[in-house]
Regions:
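Amphipathic beta-strand/beta-sheet edge segments enriched in Tyr/Trp
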Residues: 95-140
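A short, hydrophobic beta-strand-centered structural micro-motif
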Residues: 25-29, 78-108, 112
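C-terminal partner/receptor-binding element of secreted or periplasmic proteins
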Residues: 132-160
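Boundary at the C-terminal end of the N-terminal hydrophobic targeting segment
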Residues: 19-23
């Protein structure tokens, strides 16, 4: 009987200590699209890729509402996102990931995507990556490529 109780206690302690996960907050910024337009499908694909990959890797995920701008922000990204980072920190986020999706005026496809990963406390840049827009044969190819790009970011969190 003592062995059973010891075994149950061991399993309980094992699961209690492994029950935590990092929380990652996402923020999508669209620039170069008219403010009155509808949600862009490519922005939605990026957001879905972030959620899918990070959730599948065991992270708690949340997001801020997408923001649409006429052009890239004039101030530094760190200053521009400060309110969103503060809100994420207050919500318990450990990491904050920004995807700035830049569109050219004559296309609804992204011309460039900047992905920037920050540690929230203390606030510091971990990884920055720029991706040039591409044309894909199918939506499945595009989704697979986006997920692979995002999968390359996940190990950076594990380094900290």
């Amino acid at each position: 009987m003592a062995k059973k109780i010891t075994f149950v206690l061991f399993l309980g302690v094992l699961f209690v200590f492994n029950a935590s996960a990092y929380m990652v907050s996402f923020f999508i910024i669209e620039s170069g699209l008219p403010p009155e337009g509808t949600k862009n499908q490519y922005s939605q694909l990026w957001e879905n890729a972030f959620f899918d990959v990070f959730f599948d890797a065991g992270y708690i995920v949340c997001n801020s509402p997408m923001m649409r701008l006429d052009s890239k922000p004039k101030m530094s990204l760190e200053n521009f996102i400060q309110d969103e980072v503060d809100e994420a920190r207050d919500g318990g986020a450990d990491y904050f990931l920004v995807a700035q999706i830049d569109f050219s005026r004559d296309s609804l496809r992204p011309s460039e995507v900047s992905i920037v990963l920050f540690k929230v406390t203390p606030f510091r840049l971990i990884k920055e990556k720029k991706i040039t827009g591409k044309t894909y044969k199918s939506e499945k190819d595009e989704i697979d490529d986006l997920r692979n790009i995002v999968k390359g970011i996940v190990p950076k969190i594990n380094e900290f």
